[in-house]
Amino acid sequence: MFKKFSALFTLLFTLCLVNPMLVYSIDLDENTRSVPLDDAGNTVILTPEQVKRGKRLFNASCGQCHVGGITKTNPNLGLEPDALSLATPARDNINALVDYMKNPTSYDGLESIAEVHPSIKSADIFPKMRSLSDEDLFAIGGHILLQPKLSSEKWGGGKIYY
């Protein structure tokens, strides 16, 4: 019995080493990868590479405070679609999220919060933002908008899910 399980374990382990994509990838169709681009209602289809890059960069640069789409410093505001669309200006498309990551403002849009929120504008205070290009910010924005399609109510849902 032990020999059968050890042989099966060895086979699975070898497959994971030879082709790690068998374990870690999911195929997302174009409809799933389609996210809002701008306020005019245009959309963009993220490439699989942009999806991977966005996830990696979000986890490295934003995930400490926004794990699962929540905001640890302000539990009343998350990254779920409703909260993004009700912000002023609305942050429910990639261009608006890129603008926010460059120059963050309060939820009502009246005050700059660059000194307390990581951004390109405050890269001297928040070193994680220093090396991010516009393409990186685009991928992060795409990741934020893609997550509600993949995690549904869990994204931005708060403590009850995490």
UniProtKB/Swiss-Prot annotation:
Residues holding heme c: 62, 65-66, 117
Topology of this chain in the membrane: Peripheral membrane protein
Localization per Swiss-Prot or TrEMBL: Plastid, Chloroplast thylakoid membrane
Name of the protein described by the UniProt record: Photosystem II extrinsic protein V
Entry GO CC: chloroplast thylakoid membrane; photosystem II
Major location (coarse): plastid
HAMAP family according to UniProt: PSII_Cyt550
Keywords (A to Z) from UniProt: Chloroplast, Electron transport, Heme, Iron, Membrane, Metal-binding, Photosynthesis, Photosystem II, Plastid, Signal, Thylakoid, Transport
Keyword Thylakoid applies: yes
SUPFAM superfamilies: Cytochrome c
Functional summary from the UniProt entry: One of the extrinsic, lumenal subunits of photosystem II (PSII). PSII is a light-driven water plastoquinone oxidoreductase, using light energy to abstract electrons from H(2)O, generating a proton gradient subsequently used for ATP formation. The extrinsic proteins stabilize the structure of photosystem II oxygen-evolving complex (OEC), the ion environment of oxygen evolution and protect the OEC against heat-induced inactivation.
Cofactor names: heme c
InterPro entries from the UniProt entry: Cyt_c-like_dom, Cyt_c-like_dom_sf, Cytochrom_C550, PsbV_cyt_c550, PsbV_cyt_c550-like
First and last residue of the signal peptide: 1-25
GO molecular function: electron transfer activity; heme binding; iron ion binding
GO biological process, one term: photosynthesis, light reaction
Native source species: Guillardia theta
Family in the record: Belongs to the cytochrome c family. PsbV subfamily.
Subunit note: PSII is composed of 1 copy each of membrane proteins PsbA, PsbB, PsbC, PsbD, PsbE, PsbF, PsbH, PsbI, PsbJ, PsbK, PsbL, PsbM, PsbT, PsbX, PsbY, PsbZ, Psb30/Ycf12, at least 3 peripheral proteins of the oxygen-evolving complex and a large number of cofactors. It forms dimeric complexes.
Note on cofactor: Binds 1 heme c group covalently per subunit.
Pfam families: Cytochrom_C550
NCBIfam families: PS_II_C550 (TIGR03045)
